Structures are given as C-alpha cells and as structure tokens.
C-alpha cells in the first residue's frame, strides 16, 4: 500500500528520476520552458539547503557589520592615540640621540686625561703669574701691600692644582695597574714557591782574636806626679780667640776583619 502511494506521488521535483520518465519531446519542451525549469530548481532540496545557508551567512554578516560599526569610534580613538604615541616616541628618540651626543662630548671633555691636562695648564699659568708678580715687585711696579694678598692667593691656587694633579696621576696609575692582565698560573706558582722558600743562612764569620791573643795591656802607673811638677806648654791664641787651637785626635787604626768563608 505504501509503495502504491509512493508510486502515485511520483518522484521528488528536480530529482534525476523525475526527468528519466520523460520522453525526448517532453524534455525538449522542458528545456524551452525556462519558468518551469526555474520552478523545478527552486523546489529542489539542494537549492533550498543552499538558500538556507545563504540566509544564515547574510544574518551573520549583518550582525558582524553592526558590531564593527559600534566599535568604529573606539578604533578611531585608538588610531589617533597611536599616532600621538608615535610622535612622542620620535621626539623622545631625537632627544635621546641629542643627549647621547652631548654626553659623549662631555665624557671626552671631562675624561681623566683631559682633566689632568687642564690641571697642569692651570698650574703652569699660576706659576707664570707668580713669576710676573715677583718681577713687578722687584722692579717697583707693585707695592708690597698689593703684592702679598695676590701672591698668597696665587700660591694657594698653585698648591691646590699641584695636589689635584698628583692625586689624579695616582688614580690613573692605579687604573692602569688594575687593567693589566693577571700573571699566568705557572708564573704565579713560581712566585709562590720562591716566597715560601726559606732564606739560606749566611756562612759563619771568623772568630776575632781575644784580648789574650793581642797581648797584655800597657802598664798604667799607680801614682800620678803632682800637678806642679808637670810642664805646662805655652798657649798660643789668636787675636780673636783667647784660646789656642785644639789638637785634632787621629783615628785609631782598626784591625781588618778576615773575609767570610
């Protein structure tokens, strides 16, 4: 019964089975009837599925378009802020380049070597100024009251510059010593071994002769003669000095020590 109803209902419009039962003349007439072909295509399931997909895509695109249009003011504001940030970044980069250039010039100008040269030049200038002041004082071109304060200030400045130059030279020497490469391992080990090696003793010196070997000392008289009995030599004095010349004592010859063994 169901098969009879399906046969009576016929195939689905637009399906290949529906066109298969038509004769050649009917197919030729169908090709010439465009409204009928259009109606058949529209009634097919595939076309209806594509139509539904198209409607869904259109609805989705419409929703996305509305959302994008709602975000457009925010996009414009962000674009403007980004342009401002780029401008600020460009200005900061230019300022940074300018400051780096000035910093390099300042570092070159105020380097320790340049500072040392400046101090030495100031010292020479102070010395020359002191010499000029001395010449003016000797020639009478400057009074003593005006010379003393100026000369004192100049000498104080020269002393200060000399001290600064010496300290700076010491700092530069320390930096050069610290920048030198450290000694190698072998050299360091040799230096440590040399430092740890105990010093060798000196050879024993020869024993000096004692008093017994030298002989008995000369006999000293036990009783001295009276002072009146000793002759007093005459004193010869100079007109400017009432006393005579004192006799010079000759050094006692020392015995040479024997060489070390």
Swiss-Prot record:
Residues 181-195 have a biased composition (Low complexity). Residues 215-224, 231-261 have a biased composition (Pro residues). The lineage of its organism: Eukaryota, Metazoa, Chordata, Craniata, Vertebrata. This is Vacuolar protein sorting-associated protein 37D. PROSITE patterns: VPS37_C. InterPro entries: Mod_r. Signal peptide: none annotated. Belongs to the VPS37 family. Component of the ESCRT-I complex, a regulator of vesicular trafficking process. Required for the sorting of endocytic ubiquitinated cargos into multivesicular bodies. May be involved in cell growth and differentiation. It is a peripheral membrane protein. GO terms for biological process: catabolic process; protein transport. Residues 93-182 form the VPS37 C-terminal domain. Component of the ESCRT-I complex (endosomal sorting complex required for transport I) which consists of TSG101, VPS28, a VPS37 protein (VPS37A to -D) and MVB12A or MVB12B in a 1:1:1:1 stoichiometry. Interacts with TSG101 and MVB12A. Component of the ESCRT-I complex (endosomal sorting complex required for transport I) which consists of TSG101, VPS28, a VPS37 protein (VPS37A to -D) and UBAP1 in a 1:1:1:1 stoichiometry. GO terms for cellular component: ESCRT I complex; late endosome membrane. Keywords: Endosome, Membrane, Protein transport, Transport. Its main location: membrane. It is found in: Late endosome membrane. Residues 172-261 are annotated as: Disordered. Pfam families: Mod_r (PF07200).
């Amino acid at each position: 019964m169901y098969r009879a109803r399906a046969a009576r209902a016929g195939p689905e419009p637009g399906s290949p089975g529906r066109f298969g039962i038509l004769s050649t003349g009917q197919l030729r007439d169908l090709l010439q009837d465009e409204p009928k072909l259009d109606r058949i295509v529209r009634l097919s399931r595939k076309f209806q599925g594509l139509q539904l997909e198209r409607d869904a895509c259109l609805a989705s695109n419409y929703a996305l378009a509305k959302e994008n249009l709602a975000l457009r003011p925010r996009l414009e504001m962000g674009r403007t802020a980004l342009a401002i940030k780029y401008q600020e970044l460009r200005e900061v980069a230019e300022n940074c380049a300018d400051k780096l250039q000035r910093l390099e010039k300042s570092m070159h100008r105020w380097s320790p070597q340049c500072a040392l040269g400046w101090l030495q030049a100031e010292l020479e200038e102070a010395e020359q100024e002191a010499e000029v002041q001395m010449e003016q004082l000797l020639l009478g071109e400057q009074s003593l009251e005006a010379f003393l304060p100026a000369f004192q200030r100049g000498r104080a400045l020269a002393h200060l510059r000399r001290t600064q130059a010496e300290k700076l030279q010491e700092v530069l020497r320390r930096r050069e010593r610290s920048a030198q490469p450290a000694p190698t391992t072998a050299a360091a080990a040799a230096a440590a071994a040399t430092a740890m090696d105990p010093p060798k003793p000196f050879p024993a010196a020869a024993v000096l002769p004692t008093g017994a070997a030298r002989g008995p000392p000369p006999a000293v008289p036990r009783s001295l003669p009276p002072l009146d009995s000793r002759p007093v030599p005459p004193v010869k004095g100079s007109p400017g000095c009432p006393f005579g010349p004192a006799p010079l004592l000759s050094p006692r010859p020392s015995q040479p020590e024997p060489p070390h063994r």
